[in-house]
Amino acid sequence: MMTQYKLQLEATNFTKQQLQQQLDILEQNNILQIALAGRSNVGKSSLINALAGRKQLAKTSGTPGKTRSINFYAVYPNTFMLVDLPGYGYAQCSKIERQHWAMLIEYYLKNCSKLKAFVLLIDCRIPPQKLDYELAEFATSYCIPLIPVLTKIDKCKLVEQNKRQKEWRALLNNTQPLLVSSKNMKGVQQLWERIQYTIDSY
């Protein structure tokens, strides 16, 4: 039986100034954070909804690049934050907009002292991509524990899932990616357990 968690959207930040104000508040109240990031159209909003057990907490869209801000979701009864970072790698938006999203992500990772893990979402259907690997390297360079997650496994055969796990395990110093589907909920409880274990370690 799945553990029940309640998620509530607490804040949305579009600028570096807004983000710093939010980080200051969380720092003062000693609120721990778990960040989620991934390429545009990786299924991040759908996964947040699956984690929450709700359909429209995070807005989903067939158009990549839906998340254009940093969104903070309070998790109850444990009282920590899931932080939804903007999707990256969406070629159809302007270069300036892509640079702004990258700046927000980098600023957050560099300045959040309460960030306890970085959940990197990776599309199971495609081979390892440079942007995903670079973001994983960036997070680990700041000593942020990495939780790699292969999404959309309901669209991949088992042999392909195993292949992707092996590829990423080789790239991430033998860290085993979780296999998750927001559609059939496979792996969602395991992801919650990994997140909870990380929070309980502090």
Curated annotation (Swiss-Prot):
Biological processes per GO annotation: division septum assembly
Keywords of the record: Cell cycle, Cell division, GTP-binding, Magnesium, Metal-binding, Nucleotide-binding, Septation
Segments forming domain EngB-type G: 30-201
GO terms under cellular component: cytosol
Residues the entry annotates as binding Mg(2+): S45, T67
Source taxon at top rank: Bacteria
Keyword Metal-binding annotated: yes
Pfam families cross-referenced by the UniProt entry: MMR_HSR1
CDD domains membership: YihA_EngB (cd01876)
Residues that bind GTP: 38-45, 65-69, 84-87, 151-154, 180-182
Cofactor: Mg(2+)
GO MF: GTP binding; metal ion binding
Family affiliation: Belongs to the TRAFAC class TrmE-Era-EngA-EngB-Septin-like GTPase superfamily. EngB GTPase family.
Known role: Necessary for normal cell division and for the maintenance of normal septation.
Protein name in UniProt: Probable GTP-binding protein EngB
Organism: Lawsonia intracellularis (strain PHE/MN1-00)
Gene: engB
